Amino acid sequence: MRNDQPNLIVDLTLKFALNIIDYSELLESNKKYVIARQLLKSGTSIGANVREAQNAESKADFIHKLKIAAKEADETEYWLILCEKSKNYPLNDNLTTELKSIIKVLSKIISSSKK
């Protein structure tokens, strides 16, 4: 059952999703539609899966949903690296930094939940 107390990973992923929306809109304004759409899907999915995990039916379900969030984070990192290494894409250093923090927190939660 969901706990309505402050939750670091929920807060981090919500903030990240809002920043991904802004960056995707910036990409679209630069006519980078395909990457914008991919980033929007994977980047907002991280938080959606974290939220789903808060309502998990079991410990195994909780871990499974967080693993899905971690996979989405990995995909998002791929798209951000593509933007970073491609010519004519706006900078996104803050997003990469935010995402690395999220990946670390997810990894710690997953590993500690398995114990």
Across the structure, where does each feature detected by a protein language model lie?
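Short, C-terminally biased terminal segments at protein or domain edges
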Residues: 1-52, 56-115
